Amino acid sequence: METIVKRRKNQGVDKKMAKFWHYLGNIAGAILSLALYIELQVFYFYPQRIRLDHMRALVTALVTVIVLFVIFNLYKRQLKEHNDLGFNQAPHWDMRRIGIAIIGFVLILIVSMVMLSLVGRGVSNNQQALNKIELHSKGLFEIMVVFIAPFCEEVVFRGMFFNIFFTKKKITNKWLGIIVSGFLFAYMHDPMLSKFIFVYWGLGMVLAWVYMQTKDLRYSMLVHMCYNALGFI
């Protein structure tokens, strides 16, 4: 009898340790992905630092493909290990979710206008920095902001975030996750915690809502890309 009890206790300990290492591994994957994304920005925002002359474009393209591949596959690997909420299930495209993405795009425009009117005039430190970077990026700035940044940020702040936190099927978990995901997204864009953090927070929550409603990153990425593209029209 004692042997059975000990065995059950050991099994319980083993499960807890496995859960702990799984959780730690997912956090490490998210940190690695964010670090790769930040390093990739150097190729687009500060191309003059990459002293490769005529090989610069080829190296930039190659590094981009590798980074995006690694980040997205880390996300998919997390889903293979644990995916109770049913993310990234095929088929990936349908009219219902396209409709949600359209609603999300309209919402993000409304939230942006409302929040900007509430916080008042001015430009966030993040936007000021981006404006300066754009002057020296030699045409690569738009590619990063419109395509690569939304891809990487959605994988990390929506995909990986909901693989690590708020993983249980509860309505409170869903909305708390949307709020926290939005804040982390906002903090990355405004670490000085200025009044503009509320603008980014609102945008991040809309993108998190789109992801949670569609259960597919493709839709929040699409909304994010379309919103960022408006800045260049």
Identify the role of each PLM range.
Residues 1-100, 106, 176, 232-233:
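N-terminal, membrane-interfacial amphipathic/helix-forming hydrophobic leader that caps
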Residues 107, 138-233:
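Transmembrane helix-loop-helix hairpins at the membrane interface
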Residues 38-45, 72-79, 112, 116, ...:
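Membrane-water interface at transmembrane helix exits
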Residues 6-9, 15-19, 76, 80, ...:
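Context-gated lysine
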Residues 50-58, 126-132, 196-207:
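Non-cytosolic membrane-interface motifs at loop->transmembrane helix junctions
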Residues 49-53, 82-149:
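Juxtamembrane helix-loop-helix connectors linking adjacent transmembrane helices
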Residues 2-3, 25-26, 30, 61, ...:
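Residue-level signal for functionally critical sites in structured catalytic/ligand-binding pockets
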